[in-house]
């Protein structure tokens, strides 16, 4: 597999590199903005779970590029610096992080809070959906500390069977909640984005990160709050219909007959967790799984032998009572 294979399989990955974006997800935020005008009148924006920084790049151009705009990016992982973006390496579940955000805004609340974070998927869909829901609630919780009344909140969701619970929780705090699917988001993915506009918390609501919304105390956090009894959350497809299909493979031949040239990623990851494994593989030191058909008699004899069974069993146990 050559280094151009992903450019063929994922046109948005290729376009992101050609346009200087750190990740293909930049197109998702741009297409959401085309539909909802998220950046209109925004002077202070917060990007939660920001690494590697593609959404922060978009915010810095759309908000920070206005001269008076300010952008704060927050992530647990280190992120390469971006011009016009204030970076905080911190935990979004900590009150100190919320205070630091407000401090950078000189005591003023944010107009827009976005979160494109997602946990490492396990392949167990129920577990992945649950973990994503908890991450969204953590982002919502810190948003209640830093977002101004009437502000906007955009966060990634997984449209699982319990997504209606998330909608109802978000609807308590926002006058408008929609589910949006950008064109650059693969059709094969259950990923979508909750676009929440008009921040309007219940009367008497006091944000409290010491009792986060994700601690399962629904009786005190949600069930006692008054809100709509039945709301249908609209589903909106974002992006021009003529835009590229994120699930389609495109040719590398460019328009006008120009020759394709490979473009490296704009910003390689900083100290990724797989870096050590790549080094071991490159040096031929990475352990390989030994398949049964590859085992010879001699190689089997060299493998570590299990402990003698008499050291593990009561000597009174008869052989016919041992079930392996």
Swiss-Prot record:
The keyword Lyase does not apply. It catalyses: cytidine(32)/guanosine(34) in tRNA + 2 S-adenosyl-L-methionine = 2'-O-methylcytidine(32)/2'-O-methylguanosine(34) in tRNA + 2 S-adenosyl-L-homocysteine + 2 H(+). Pfam families: FtsJ. GO terms for molecular function: S-adenosyl-L-methionine binding; tRNA (cytidine(32)/guanosine(34)-2'-O)-methyltransferase activity; tRNA (guanine) methyltransferase activity. One of its GO terms (cellular component) is nucleus. It is found in: Cytoplasm; Nucleus. It comes from the Eukaryota. The active site is at residue 156. Its main location: cytoplasm. S-adenosyl-L-methionine binds at residues 53, 55, 75, 91, 116. Methylates the 2'-O-ribose of nucleotides at positions 32 and 34 of the tRNA anticodon loop of substrate tRNAs. Requisite for faithful cytoplasmic translation. Requires THADA for methylation of the cytidine at position 32 of the anticodon loop of substrate tRNAs. Requires WDR6 for methylation of the nucleotide at position 34 of the anticodon loop of substrate tRNAs. Promotes translation efficiency of the UUU codon. Plays a role in neurogenesis. Required for expression of genes involved in neurogenesis and mitochondrial translation and energy generation. Interacts with WDR6; the interaction is direct, and required for 2'-O-methylation of position 34 in substrate tRNAs. This is tRNA (cytidine(32)/guanosine(34)-2'-O)-methyltransferase. It comes from Mus musculus (Mouse). The gene is Ftsj1.
């Amino acid at each position: 597999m050559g280094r151009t294979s992903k450019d063929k399989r994922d046109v948005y990955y290729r376009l992101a590199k050609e346009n200087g974006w750190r990740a293909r997800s930049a197109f998702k935020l741009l297409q959401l903005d085309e539909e909802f005008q998220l950046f209109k009148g925004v002077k202070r924006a917060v990007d939660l779970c920001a690494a590697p920084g593609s959404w922060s790049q978009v915010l810095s151009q759309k908000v920070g590029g206005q001269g008076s705009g300010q952008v704060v990016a927050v992530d647990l992982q280190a992120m390469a610096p971006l011009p016009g973006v204030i970076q905080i390496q911190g935990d979004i579940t900590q009150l100190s992080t919320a205070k630091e955000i407000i401090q950078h805004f000189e005591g003023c609340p944010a107009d827009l809070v976005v979160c494109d974070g997602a946990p490492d998927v396990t392949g167990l869909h129920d577990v992945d959906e649950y973990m994503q829901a908890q991450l969204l609630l953590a982002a919502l919780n810190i948003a209640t500390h830093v977002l101004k009344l009437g502000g906007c909140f955009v966060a990634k969701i997984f449209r699982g069977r319990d997504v209606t619970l998330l909608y109802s929780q978000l609807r308590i705090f926002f006058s408008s909640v929609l589910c949006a699917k950008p064109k650059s988001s693969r059709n094969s993915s259950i990923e979508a984005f909750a676009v929440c506009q008009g921040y309007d918390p219940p009367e008497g609501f006091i944000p409290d990160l010491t009792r986060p919304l994700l601690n399962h105390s629904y009786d005190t956090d949600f069930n006692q709050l008054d809100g709509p009894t039945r709301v249908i959350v609209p589903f909106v497809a974002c992006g021009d219909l003529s835009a590229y299909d994120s699930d389609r493979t495109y040719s590398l031949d460019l328009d006008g007959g120009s020759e394709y040239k490979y473009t490296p990623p704009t910003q390689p990851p900083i100290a990724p967790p797989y870096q050590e494994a790549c080094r071991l593989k490159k040096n031929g030191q990475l352990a390989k799984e030994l398949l049964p058909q590859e085992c010879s008699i001699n190689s089997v004899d060299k493998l570590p032998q299990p402990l003698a069974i008499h050291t593990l069993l009561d000597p009174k146990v008869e052989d016919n009572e041992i079930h392996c």
